[in-house]
A protein has these predicted regions:
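M16 family metallopeptidases and their MPP-like homologs
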Residues: 1, 25-141, 160-178
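Active/ligand-binding-proximal structured segments within catalytic/core domains
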Residues: 4-16
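Active-site cores of enzymes that catalyze phosphoryl transfer or operate on phosphate-rich substrates
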Residues: 19
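Nucleic-acid-processing active sites and adjacent nucleic-acid-binding tracks
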Residues: 148
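Core subunits and conserved enzymes of cellular information-processing
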Residues: 152-155
Length: 179
């Protein structure tokens, strides 16, 4: 992944997992298999990416139903296209956050951190500081080239490096640690 796709995944994670207007989030919550649904995107300075989705208030027995609904809904979103108003809203939010970060008091330290991380992995340290080109390219690709839909298909649906993890509480753990 590169800087452009990292930025795209940040916006896409909000569209898919965190926005109240997300068809994916709304379908999963309305299905009754969980109380809440969310997800996040993690990246490193060397552009390694992880997309994580989670259910809150669900049971392990709902894993297959969740996986089927998740994949069907992502496929539908990728085939039919994402809602342009939702994309514009999340792109605006991302752009606002990027510009807001540029006005922080410790801006110099942030710039050094961004450029050093890029330099460390043999990337252009100055490219990491240029946001205008990043923002305009992201907006153009998302709204004119079905970029987010392609990412959903290639990186989420057709990705062989997918892991499913179930975390269940141990009801006796509190009593055990208190003893």
């Amino acid at each position: 992944a590169d800087r452009d796709s990292n930025a795209a995944f940040q916006v896409l994670a909000n569209i898919l997992y965190n926005s109240d207007g997300s068809p994916l989030k709304n379908k999963i919550i309305s299905s009754g298999i969980c109380k809440d649904f969310g997800g996040l995107y993690l990246s490193s300075s060397c552009f390694n990416t992880i997309m994580m989705t989670y259910l809150v208030g669900s049971e392990a027995t709902h894993l297959e139903a969740f996986d089927q609904l998740y994949r069907e809904t992502l496929k539908q979103m990728s085939d039919e296209g994402l809602d342009s108003d939702l994309m514009v809203s999340e792109l605006n939010k991302y752009e606002f956050n990027v510009r807001e970060d540029a006005s922080k008091a410790q801006r110099g330290l942030d710039l050094i951190g961004k450029s050093m991380a890029a330099f460390k992995y043999s990337n252009d340290p100055f490219k990491a500081l240029k946001t205008e080109e990043l923002l305009s390219n992201l907006r153009r690709k998302a709204l004119e080239e079905n970029y987010f839909e392609q990412l959903i298909k290639e990186r989420l649906l057709d990705n062989p490096a997918t892991v499913k993890v179930i975390l269940e509480p141990d009801p006796g753990k509190i009593a055990e640690t208190a003893a």
